[in-house]
Curated annotation (Swiss-Prot):
Belongs to the KAE1 / TsaD family. It comes from the Bacteria. The gene is tsaD. HAMAP family: TsaD. This is tRNA N6-adenosine threonylcarbamoyltransferase. GO terms for cellular component: cytoplasm. CDD domains: ASKHA_NBD_TsaD_bac. Substrate binds at V133, V134, S135, G136, A137, D166, G179, N278. It comes from Chlamydia pneumoniae (Chlamydophila pneumoniae). One of its GO terms (biological process) is tRNA threonylcarbamoyladenosine modification.
Length: 344
């Protein structure tokens, strides 16, 4: 079975083709550089760009796989969560292809797909497992009993970890997206230069707003506004703040894991999302947990359509009926069920 996946939940326009063995035959991702000057994604610009770019990435994916639309068995498209305009563009492209080529169409949950990206690239994952999604929009922990059953056990109470990296980057005067730049600066900084403390919140939830404010005050002074211009700071100070912040942000998540693993008798860890590409984060997780940890390859950490096609194909094969696609901007935490057909 061949599945063509479409991803447009935010500012990446992506198309991929995946077969029933989880082999990626094509994986095309077009990032939108137009948002950099705004310091973040502008929803209207993102949706307009998707309209322009989708035909190109779809054609490139088909060319890369040396296939035709007629060869596809299924069209999978991101339906939730994300920017409503961007989601709508992707869904309507998917519907158009499905109707025109007389193919089946299935909607996919973007957050579930990030977890599936780790599962997709792994071999012999042992269950039950702990699942972590660490991205620009979401930070959450899941108990995965088996590949078709899991439940939410903790999530951020405020900012997502990836969002926090970008906001701290703005404080430091770095361009968007700031995550890779902070990681690079941190390599030459001292992580103990600033006493940023990882947040401690009850249960298995996370919090990053206090850390974000602490970094703001370290750069601009107490009671500063996030919108006030960043002062001129030395490269050495940039490096030290980046390293100290990165340590605290990663520790905020890593410190929770041993307790979760013990409580739920987890035998492995699956991690997905853009922050999963950060090498310091990977090391912190592996150090905190004496378990097999499965990260996606770098090309599947950020938003991509291969994870959408893979999860869509898996769901289609395991379910006898396909629910109607429902576009939804917000993630519906109470109705998650990875690798299954969960409607928002």
């Amino acid at each position: 079975m061949l599945t063509l996946g479409l991803e447009s939940s935010c500012d990446e326009t992506a198309c991929a083709i995946v077969n029933e063995d989880k082999q990626i035959l094509a994986n095309i991702i077009a990032s939108q550089d137009i948002h950099a000057s705004y310091g973040g994604v502008v929803p209207e610009l993102a949706s307009r760009a998707h309209l322009h770019i989708f035909p190109q990435v779809i054609n490139k994916a088909l060319q890369q796989a040396n296939l035709l639309i007629e060869d596809m068995d299924l069209i999978a498209v991101t339906q939730t969560p994300g920017l409503i305009g961007s989601l709508s563009v992707g869904v309507h492209f998917g519907k158009g292809i499905a109707i025109g080529a007389k193919k089946s169409l299935i909607g996919v949950n973007h957050v579930e797909a990030h977890l599936y990206a780790a599962y997709m690239a792994a071999q012999n994952v042992q269950f039950p497992a702990l699942g972590l999604v660490v991205s620009g929009a979401h930070t959450a922990a899941f108990f995965i009993e088996n590949p078709t059953s899991y439940k939410l056990i903790g999530k951020t109470r405020d900012d997502a970890i990836g969002e926090t990296f970008d906001k701290v980057g703005r404080f430091l005067g770095l361009p968007y997206p700031a995550g890779p730049l902070i990681e690079k600066l941190a390599l030459e900084g001292s992580e103990d230069s600033y006493p940023f403390s990882p947040a401690k919140v009850p249960n298995y939830d996370f919090s990053f707003s206090g850390l974000k404010t602490a970094v703001l005050y370290a750069i601009k002074g107490n009671n500063s506004s996030p919108r006030s211009p960043a002062p001129e700071i030395s490269l050495e100070k940039q490096r030290d703040i980046a390293a100290s912040f990165q340590k605290a942000a990663c520790t905020t998540i890593a410190q929770k894991l041993p307790t979760i693993i013990k409580e739920f008798s987890c035998r492995s860890i699956l991690i997905g999302g853009g922050v999963a590409i950060n090498e310091y984060f990977r090391s912190a997780i592996q150090t905190a947990c004496n378990l097999p940890v499965y990260f996606p390859p770098a090309k599947l950490c950020s938003d991509n359509a291969a994870m959408i096609a893979g999860l869509g194909g898996e769901n289609f094969q395991k379910n006898s009926s396909i629910p109607e696609i429902r576009i939804c901007a917000r993630y519906q935490w109470e109705s998650v069920s990875p690798f299954s057909l969960a409607s928002p």
